[in-house]
Amino acid sequence: MEERTIPELLRPSHEKGAFFEHCKVCNRELIEAQNDYCIEKVVKKQGDPPVDNVLFEYAICINCMNNLRNQMSAESQSAIMRYQIRKMAESPWQSEEEVMNSFKDDRCLFSGKHRDDMQQYTLVGYCRGKELQADRPPAMLDHLFLEEIQDLISDETRDELDRFSGDNFGWPPEVARQLKNGDLVFL
């Protein structure tokens, strides 16, 4: 049987071995209740020599994620879907197994670029309890792709993402500035 326990990369950076226990938006319990949720973590290399620094991380239950998606314009949802399909078709992976292993191998899902070669990247994992969902592999995405996605979304959707972030996360100013540059993914 394949190991599906959430890997350390997708766990809270401030407490080794811990799991995200509650939805950042509604505070719904995630682990014991076996609720479906998504983890997002944005990491940027800083310093000399460069060291990975977590800019922000959170878990959001699927209900809250779907509520946000429903607020996105149909135009933006369609543009993001087309973009993801195109990028997967252009990716270096030749098999489903290679796609599944890209995260484990510290490689960008779309480009195959190694984590060491990315200045900033986002980690995304869909989970239930303490395990990754078997049908949705975790992903590592080079920040360059997220910038491209930001160029695809409508002003209406961008405003909604900004409002959602402000209402639900209360980020420190340095993180809020980063979010304005399009780091909130919700794939």
Residue ranges and their predicted role:
Residues 6, 25, 31, 39, ...:
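Weak global preference for isoleucine
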Residues 88-187:
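Long, contiguous alpha-helical scaffold regions
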Residues 27, 35, 53, 63-70, ...:
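Detector for Asparagine
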Residues 17-53, 102-136:
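Short recognition patches in nucleic-acid-associated and regulatory proteins
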Residues 11, 31, 56, 66-69, ...:
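Compositionally biased amphipathic helical and low-complexity segments enriched in hydrophobic
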Residues 50-81, 133-162:
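Short metal-binding segments enriched for Cys and/or His
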Residues 1-12, 39-48, 84-97, 124-125:
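Short Cys/His-rich Zn2+-coordinating modules
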Residues 4-9, 24, 28, 75-79, ...:
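A generic short-segment signal for beta-strand/edge and adjacent turn/coil regions
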